[in-house]
Amino acid sequence: MIFIKENTAKMTRNKAIACLVFLTVLDFLMNIGAALMSSLAIEGEEQKLGTVIGIDLGTTYSCVGVYHNKHVEIIANDQGNRITPSWVAFTDTERLIGEAAKNQAAKNPERTIFDPKRLIGRKFDDPDVQRDIKFLPYKVVNKDGKPYIQVKVKGEEKLFSPEEISAMILTKMKETAEAFLGKKIKDAVITVPAYFNDAQRQATKDAGAIAGLNVVRIINEPTGAAIAYGLDKKGGESNILVYDLGGGTFDVSILTIDNGVFEVLSTSGDTHLGGEDFDHRVMDYFIKLVKKKYNKDISKDHKALGKLRRECELAKRSLSNQHQVRVEIESLFDGVDFSEPLTRARFEELNMDLFKKTMEPVKKALKDAGLKKSDIDEIVLVGGSTRIPKVQQMLKDFFDGKEPSKGTNPDEAVAYGAAVQGGVLSGEGGEETQNILLLDVAPLSLGIETVGGVMTNIIPRNTVIPTKKSQVFTTYQDQQTTVTINVYEGERSMTKDNRELGKFDLTGILPAPRGVPQIEVTFEVDANGILQVKAEDKVAKTSQSITITNDKGRLTEEEIEEMIREAEEFAEEDKIMKEKIDARNKLETYVYNMKSTVADKEKLAKKISDEDKEKMEGVLKEALEWLEENVNAEKEDYDEKLKEVELVCDPVIKSVYEKTEGENEDDDGDDHDEL
């Protein structure tokens, strides 16, 4: 490997200072330029974008909203719920998403997929991924260093990337919005944890593309929640701390809100800490209890774990309002019914180290923002896990008795903010949103490797984005014609302790003694937090650039296209399945309506002749038997069978109605008074 280092050896002190001043001014101008370009890009988007929906793609639940008729509408799904489980399942006949998938998980564990957000943008050998796999009933395999989900679909084994599963959930949210708005939707703002790295952000964008969405902006979840909190807040400047503890991720962001300007001062967090981890602790506790009490190891029994997971999640939720619950599971294993108490105190004891772990990012965010505890005006709670009383108490104690704000719905705040940002970008937000300005930050320092494996930062963490920064480096060896630019993100001083984002070679450097060539490296982070790196030989005028998108784990354009095609096939299959179910329901409904008509002696039944009645009962009985024997018939078969039944029943019912109307007219005639 060839390292490069800064060319400062031959500078005099005065020249160095002059150069530093010049570069600082230049850097400032470049930042202004980047912001202006971003502004122009947004104006361009406003002209061509349709309605832009806001989607909170959560680990455990997802939510969709839209800025509509001068306010944000959080949209209920087809089950009437405003949040949808981030679950996908495959049965022998169909694909299920949301509640339908989660509700059948216990009897179909190996083909029910959840938590794709904990895998997205990560490598297979990531310790967090390996830790999660032991709790997952479905199979996660290594494909090109990435975690892929292996599941049986219609008899054959298929591999799905986390992006594809996430795309299925996004498709469900898109369809939910389309049903509400009555039109097709293409454009969306999608939220990600503030501490998501470059690879995870890009993978989320890819998931949007697979779902057929144009992801116009990726915004950070705490920033979305801050918008929800501060949209209607008038008056002077205030500092707010957003504490976002969700199902699988944790973020802390500190923002200044001042009349519609939302400026992020700092952000910190843990992309692998949330409610699921609390569930896992409780599951571990009961797995050990079962082993001790019944001498049975259920840790590899996927059905038992599925039942236990569901009940542990319910128990956790109940303990936010009660001090004790009983975890009861019918036939947990070998016909044994499980029933054990769980107290709030035990739950807190099992998770105390995790609760305490959330306080470290709070301290870090305050330090990075240069603020004291007393400088925070409001604490905003986001994410379902913030309902846990111990979490609220620890936060209150840390802030010397300050009560967190309860004004925002922790499940919906992020989608609400994303919908507002969608209204800003589309122009549909009108006057209410025209003064909103988001100034977000890069969550991690970005830099390159220089001599000795040193991390040289180009963009420090918490730099306002979009941004563009450059530094000049030089060669390390005489006559060097190629340098390798290794790009990293992280806060450690050595690159081996940070995360490699990618690398590329700059070739065609004019041969010269070491220290002579001038190589300018430019880092540009867009409004989505995605990085592009460019290296240019200032003398030879040769340059090379790459968009850093986790070049080892990123889906290729071809893979994305293939996944889009597969997603369209699934959508077509879903449509066919829905039409089939609708046709079956239509036939069933007709048959049962006719049965009750024939049986109802108080109404029409007594007016149907015995011969017609026998004919109708015969065809209805035959139709019900046919339905039992043809569970997986095609839509056309159900339609054909309905026509057969209607052919017998409709003329009889029509004739009875006509006869009844005639009798009513005769009766009416008799009742008229004489003039």
From Swiss-Prot:
Disruption phenotype: Bip1, bip2 and bip3 triple mutation is pollen lethal. Bip1, bip2 and bip3 triple mutation affects female gametophyte development during the early stages.
Signal peptide (UniProt feature, chain positions): 1-35
Region (Disordered): 656-675
Compartment(s) where it occurs, according to its Swiss-Prot or TrEMBL record: Endoplasmic reticulum lumen; Nucleus
Gene3D superfamilies per record: 1.20.1270.10, 3.30.420.40, Actin, Chain A, domain 4, Substrate Binding Domain Of DNAk, Chain A, domain 1
Record field: compositional bias (Acidic residues): 663-675
Residue interval(s) of motif Prevents secretion from ER: 673-675
Tagged with keyword Hydrolase: no
Chief place of localization: endoplasmic reticulum
Quaternary structure (record): Interacts with BZIP28 (via C-terminus). Interacts with ERDJ3A.
Function: In cooperation with other chaperones, Hsp70s are key components that facilitate folding of de novo synthesized proteins, assist translocation of precursor proteins into organelles, and are responsible for degradation of damaged protein under stress conditions. Required for pollen development and pollen tube growth. May be required for the early stages of female gametophyte development, but not for polar nuclei fusion during female gametophyte. Possesses ATPase activity in vitro.
Similarity comment: family membership: Belongs to the heat shock protein 70 (TC 1.A.33) family. DnaK subfamily.
Protein known as: Heat shock 70 kDa protein BIP3
Species assigned in the record: Arabidopsis thaliana
